[in-house]
Regions:
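N-terminal active-site segment of His-dependent metallophosphoesterases
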Residues: 1-68, 72, 373-378, 382-383
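Conserved catalytic scaffold of divalent metal-dependent phosphoesterases
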Residues: 92, 96, 100-199
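Active-site neighborhood of phospho(di)ester-bond hydrolases with catalytic His/Asp-centered motifs
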Residues: 6-7, 43-48, 76-83, 103-108, ...
Length: 385
């Protein structure tokens, strides 16, 4: 059985003021071409369909067109919600969609959605587990423990997922595939991207051994492709580059071919980007020596003297200039006020860190930077309702 593993489409995303519609469509067209060529039995999309919980009308239309073209290929489509999605909105019309072989699981009501497919080796059971927090699991599973005094105790993410997996009643004698959108870790720290939502102190970490009962775990949430402890537990990464930290990633579609129980192979189909992502550090003269281009560019200038109209000059070469920063030879930044245009190019957490540095004359600690990101995330989540 051949499966395509995708995640983190983030339809409607805006990066440093640049709308990514054309970049997304360019990549989606490649995915559709691969589907027609490879004819997978199922396409799995592991969460973060949209970039916002309340997507724009255009974002909904873009996803509708992509989903329609996927469905026209005849493949079965399996979709879950991610932390960026509105679970309830993603559930809309899911019953009707099942009749078109599109299975969407947005909300968690105490059990994962189960879809069973067959091939020459028998059944393959898919468990669709949308993004959850421990409170979601605790509030929907009434039989967490037989000890009443412990029922009010808070669950860690690992404990919550253990309970959720136990509720799935997975048959270990059959082939089982989990689709999930969580932060799953092995020993150490996963490779993360600047475009991801970050939690404080790894509170959302889930130990990968929770999923050992599955033959393959199709994960979404982390934006760089990577396996977690073993090849069968995998993040496919975003199909589109969304930050400079992903500039060197080879984006791809993960292809999983299931054989008989215990046998599978994994390969990747490359996805090319509409724009290159260019990170440059050097003098203005060096930066201006390139030919005019449409790369998404981050320029860090090391010039010692003050430069007038630097952004206007750089934009004559870099049409899609995302940010300009200044750095002294020793790696520090010169003490100068930012222009309004400079501030507009900063993410909210970067703007706060810059403000803190200028007022307090010291860098914001890593711990406090993570805390500020979480506060900003909570603020936007509350606004999005």
């Amino acid at each position: 059985m051949k499966l395509f593993h995708l995640s983190d489409l983030h339809i409607g995303k805006i990066v440093n003021g640049y709308e990514m519609w054309e970049d997304q469509r360019y990549v989606f067209d490649q995915i559709l071409a691969y589907v027609r060529e490879e004819q997978p039995d199922a396409v799995m999309i592991a969460g973060d369909i949209y970039d916002k919980a309340v997507p724009s009308a255009k974002a909904v239309t873009e996803f509708d067109e992509f989903l329609t073209e996927l469905a026209d290929s005849g493949t079965i489509i399996l979709i879950i919600s991610g932390n960026h999605d509105s679970a309830e909105r993603l559930d809309f019309a899911s019953s009707i969609m099942k009749k078109q072989n599109i299975y969407m699981k947005g909300t968690y009501g105490g059990e994962a959605m189960k879809v069973t497919m067959q091939d020459k080796w028998g059944d393959v059971n898919f468990c669709l587990m949308p993004f959850v927090k421990p409170a979601n699991v605790k509030n929907t599973l009434s039989d967490l423990t037989e000890e009443p005094e412990k029922e009010s105790a808070a669950l860690t993410y690992t404990e919550a997922m253990q309970q959720a997996v136990a509720a799935m009643q997975v048959d270990p004698g059959k082939r089982n595939v989990l689709i999930a959108h969580q932060n799953v870790t092995n020993s150490g720290v996963n490779r993360r991207s600047d475009s991801e939502t970050i939690s404080i102190g790894g509170l959302d970490n889930i130990d990968r051994t929770v999923f050992d009962i599955f033959d393959y775990v199709a994960l979404g949430h982390l934006h760089s492709p990577q396996q977690i402890g073993k090849p069968e537990i995998r993040y496919c990464g975003t199909p589109v580059i969304y930050s400079m930290s992903e500039a060197d990633d080879q984006k791809s579609v993960t292809v999983v071919e299931l054989g008989e129980k215990g046998k599978l192979s994994i390969r990747e189909l490359p996805l090319h980007q509409l724009h290159a992502w260019y990170n440059f550090t050097g003098t203005l003269d060096e930066a201006m020596s390139r030919e005019a281009n449409e790369d998404y560019a981050r320029i860090v200038l090391t010039d010692k003297e003050t430069i007038i109209d630097v952004q206007a000059r750089l934009r004559t070469v870099y049409k899609n200039l995302m940010s300009v920063e200044f750095q002294m030879a020793d790696g520090s930044r010169p003490e100068q006020e930012r222009t309004l245009e400079d501030v507009k190019n900063l993410a909210p957490d970067e703007a706060f860190a810059d403000f803190y540095n200028r007022k307090m004359k010291r860098e914001l600690s890593d711990e406090n930077a993570v805390y500020i990101r979480q506060l900003i995330r909570d603020y936007y989540e509350q606004r999005q309702g």
